[in-house]
Amino acid sequence: MKVRLLSIGKDRSGLYEPAVQEYAKRLGHYTRFELVEMAEASGKRLKPGDAKAAEAEAILSKRKPQDWLVALDERGSLLDSVELSRYVGKAQTGAKDLLFIIGGDEGLDARVRDAANLTLSLSKMTLPHRLARVVLIEQLYRAFTILKGEPYHK
């Protein structure tokens, strides 16, 4: 099984990158993990909503037939860590790869949410997209430790 995180934009501040790298390294002990950073759609000629539409096309073009698509969106389901671990476990037994999507500043286009097998919210609070990466990767690491019965999750 492979876990990919497709995220629009880069962490230009460098603030979150050390945590992303640390949890990605830990996650790598359990599964193949890949972070794919995609460019934000931009330009002076873009109308409101056009960036989301352009990003949606780029995102959906990266989906493979074996992927279970999980879109992160404020309207999504709130899962606790154990529930997320069960979802990851189902993907493992179904021989599916997981593709998590974090949209750009405007969020995700409806086409991405509609294509998703699961729409997931990390919190009722609004999080910066770069911080959402850290939270998600840590929760994925936690999910695998739960599945393995390891003591990280308390």
Curated annotation (Swiss-Prot):
It catalyses: pseudouridine(1915) in 23S rRNA + S-adenosyl-L-methionine = N(3)-methylpseudouridine(1915) in 23S rRNA + S-adenosyl-L-homocysteine + H(+). It comes from the Bacteria. GO terms for cellular component: cytoplasm. Its EC number is 2.1.1.177. Keywords: Cytoplasm, Methyltransferase, rRNA processing, S-adenosyl-L-methionine, Transferase. S-adenosyl-L-methionine binds at residues 72, 103, 122-127. One of its GO terms (molecular function) is rRNA (pseudouridine-N3-)-methyltransferase activity. Gene3D superfamilies: 3.40.1280.10. Pfam families: SPOUT_MTase. It is found in: Cytoplasm. Specifically methylates the pseudouridine at position 1915 (m3Psi1915) in 23S rRNA. Homodimer. Belongs to the RNA methyltransferase RlmH family. This is Ribosomal RNA large subunit methyltransferase H. It comes from Myxococcus xanthus (strain DK1622). The gene is rlmH.
